[in-house]
Design a protein with these regions (language model features):
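Hydrophobic, aromatic-enriched interface-forming segments
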Residues: 126-195
Length: 314
């Protein structure tokens, strides 16, 4: 399978989660083994990725959905998101039922790039990213995933100096465990009383503490709200606001795409405009984008009022 991989000028991965971190670092190791070269790693959120030109003549992309602009000679995509694009020029390694990290690790295994520590880490990443909630390791797997959500992609990358194995049993996992035991129940109790309607099918969940993804998962699992899609916000130090969308029956991705985002059917994300500074800004923006018919209806009603006034004046 790796015989079809071109020599990359760049490796690009998803910045938002552990799967992107695992995928990117594993592909760097694979490139070193195949071509004896150190290939630079870049990571993007969905909005930044869509704005990036593919200026290199060759590259590898992981954990970002395959789309027509990526169908280029000497490009390879290793991913697990749904896509309607079939490759004609690029190499596509794709499986909806495996995380991107697992797909990359399977390529590494073909060249002996394995270890018990990596076996364990890739396994936990796969559980958290695919959200295999019935797996006995699900809780600890979510603690690992929360490391990237809490500390950020590049901070963790620097902390372990690109050596994934150092994440296994890292001391910071004790922090994640404490946060899960103490913060999550408090956060869930507060958030369940603070859900705002965005549209008839989308609710905004305000959060103050705890793991947003697990809180929303419980809200959906327990049918606490009437909305099939729930949105939470995460603000990065750069000022960007990331919207995280969750559902149980595949509705989240369709909503994310309306926001120029992407992801999985039940777990997606989107970057909101930089003009969004507060939760109320976000609510106003989301309502505007996700309720176009309501806006048209209101506009038509207003137009009718003006028409009536004109007739009275006439």
């Amino acid at each position: 399978m790796t015989k079809n991989l071109p020599r990359p000028d760049v490796i690009i991965t998803h910045e938002s989660d552990l799967d992107g971190l695992v995928s990117g670092i594993l592909l760097q190791r694979l490139a070193k083994a195949l071509f004896n070269t150190d290939v630079r790693l870049e990571a993007y959120h969905y909005h930044g990725w869509r704005q990036r030109d593919l200026r290199e003549s060759a590259g590898w992309v992981a954990d970002l959905a395959f789309e027509p602009r990526m169908d280029r000679p000497n490009w390879a995509v290793i991913d697990h998101h749904a896509t309607e694009t079939l490759p004609k020029n690029a190499t596509l390694i794709h499986n909806l039922e495996k995380s991107a990290g697992l797909l990359c690790y399977e390529l590494c295994q073909l060249h002996g790039l394995t270890s018990p520590a990596l076996d364990r880490l890739v396994h936990l990443n796969n559980i958290s990213d695919i959200f295999l909630e019935d797996d006995p390791d699900f809780v600890i797997a979510c603690d690992y995933a929360n490391l990237v959500k809490t500390y950020g992609f590049w901070n963790l990358h620097a902390l372990v100096n690109g050596q994934l194995e150092k994440l296994l049993d890292h001391a910071l996992l004790e922090v994640m465990a404490v946060k899960r035991r103490i913060e999550d129940p408090i956060g869930l109790a507060w958030s369940r009383e603070n859900v705002t309607e965005i549209s008839p099918t989308v609710g905004f969940v305000d959060t103050v503490i705890g793991n947003n993804n697990l809180i929303v998962h419980q809200l959906l699992e327990q049918n606490i709200t009437r909305f099939p899609v729930l949105i939470t916000l995460f603000r990065r130090t750069s000022g960007m606001t990331i919207a995280s969308l969750r559902s149980r029956n595949g509705e989240a991705l369709k909503v994310a795409e309306k926001l120029q985002g992407g992801g999985h059917a039940n777990a997606s994300g989107a970057t909101l405009p930089r003009s969004v500074k507060t939760n109320q800004d976000a609510i106003n923006y989301l309502r505007q984008v996700l309720n176009p018919r309501r806006e048209i209806s209101e506009f038509n009603s207003l137009e009718s009022v003006f028409d009536a006034l004109e007739k009275e004046r006439g």
